[in-house]
Amino acid sequence: KLPDKVVIHINDTHPTMAIPEMMRLLMDEKGLGWDEAWDIVTHVFAYTNHTVMSEALEKWPLDMFRKILPRVYMIVEEMNRRLMIRLNEVYPNDSAKHKYMAIISDNQIFMANMCLASCFAVNGVSKLHTDILKQDIFADYYNMNNDHFYAITNGITFRRWIANCNPELTELISSKIGKNWIKDASELSKLKKYAKDPAFKKQFA
């Protein structure tokens, strides 16, 4: 049920630790098995990449990570093991490709690869940027999961910042155009006819 209610946005690689931490919570605190927890996690997280510069794709020393977060490291290690099985199925006997697509490689943990292996959606912030991700930076991940990649210009979600956070405005909008706008933003264009309506403007203010 959780993926029907919540999407967690990994906005660049900085919040990536949320992925294995949610696995830990679901398994250790809620008693779920790996497969059930993984099915939830891989339908909750979405990843936005902001730059094609490799310097911005975070990686962390394995020894430090394992020392500070031993349980989370165990989960990341299992994520990587399962990823390696998948990579060998998709790109058999290509050890060089497996190495740079791995979550754990050369005694480092690669956060972008963790996102690519875990998120149901991956987007660049423009069509050109996304084309570069698909054709160059993340090309082999794109070939493996091409239905995960999108070009989306960043913005806010009106469902959270209007529908959830501003019930008065939500009620006003819905009273004029119905509730379909909550699922379809294009419906908001119906408000144009009220732009010069004194009563509506007074309520809006």
Predicted feature descriptions by range:
Residues 1-205:
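Catalytic cores of carbohydrate-active enzymes across secretory and cytosolic contexts
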